[in-house]
């Protein structure tokens, strides 16, 4: 493996330090902050809507001279989801899913989530009309990277599954980042040849970041969201964590609105609107979450988004969601994330950004919350991260009731050194005694201010009538503690082989 190569998640384009406008999102400061924006929007829409539409789109489009992408006539109104999703009764069911890399065994009897490869195929089996996917890039075959390895078979089976859906006239719609990182992959060309609709979103030109989201909306009823890319390595060589929600049209159609922000920006000459039209607005957010039973368990849930410029009115900003989860904790905050930097990561000159770092310290000091941070270390780790991790660890003072612990999780390379950009814990989640957060972003400023991502925030209470029911935050806590107590999680003073981790 060439140490000078960069992992796809680290190849986010350099950004200039641009101030982000105050977009009409739900913020942690004022639950009614969008009201004035809505009134102003109503006054302006009559004069500006025609101009805005003409500026955003100039006719039907095809992205390449080979006409890989079907021509479409864009519209501010998103594509209507097929079927009768709005009429379906919600009987929401949430399932945690994960990928455990090959040759990464845990102790017998350890808690597990449903295997991601199996869960994705089962989710696609439910599709009757449409599958909408927001993705960073696609690389589902070993040939994409010149690797002949049996561990690529699950990704190849997934690609075949998508082709089968298209042959059954099930719509497959993909919004992905442009330019793609998987430059030798033919996955999207293959799907387009079978009738998939694909748009590439030049996110760097629009927000200064990338389209880093990883979620699916199936039939306007079912959802996947999590850390896994559309990459065969995410199924067998990289540790991932996500969630699938079945039969939850209210949440699914709310997440669909975020998908549609990407979709409309994937047209030629698209620009970010100063104010998103009302049909992109959300009424499900931090201050007004969806409330109802998930498998009989009382649940609140909502989606957040980043960056602020992709938050129409009512959408909670991802950073505000993360801070809100921390603020609500009373006993513990456990975080598992690939990278942790209290700085910018992709600007020409790094800028200090202590927002999340301060929030963890404040929770530990002010409320006596037990903080645990599990960060990944692998062959492509930037070793400057460890100074920040040691600084946070040094804040711990058990005699004063301040508990902050930091470990690194290392996936041994073993005999898999022939597979580049693998063998890493890629999860991005947080769990407290009150709430579970499953996201798509690493923790540095750029992911929240410039890069497109989403978060799922869920809180459950065990009903008295179901004393044996396990809340999603309890399930996620068990998975975190399994990882934390395993021999793959190491204290910051440990020495490890450089093949597995650049310390």
Swiss-Prot record:
Residue ranges of every copy of the PLD phosphodiesterase domain listed in the record: 207-234, 421-447
**Which residues are catalytic?**
212, 214, 219, 426, 428, 433
Which parts of the chain span the membrane according to its record?
37-57
| Bridged cysteine pairs (disulfide) | 92-248, 377-501
* EC numbers for this chain: 3.1.16.1, 3.1.4.-
The effect of pH on activity is described as: Optimum pH is about 5.
Q: What does this protein do?
A: 5'->3' exonuclease that hydrolyzes the phosphodiester bond of single-stranded DNA (ssDNA) and RNA molecules to form nucleoside 3'-monophosphates and 5'-end 5'-hydroxy deoxyribonucleotide/ribonucleotide fragments. Partially redundant with PLD4, can cleave all four nucleotides displaying higher efficiency for ssDNA and RNA fragments initiated with uridine and guanosine residues and lower efficiency for cytidine-initiated substrates.
Q: What is this protein called?
A: 5'-3' exonuclease PLD4
Q: Which organism is it from?
A: Mus musculus
> What gene, per UniProt, encodes this protein?
Pld4
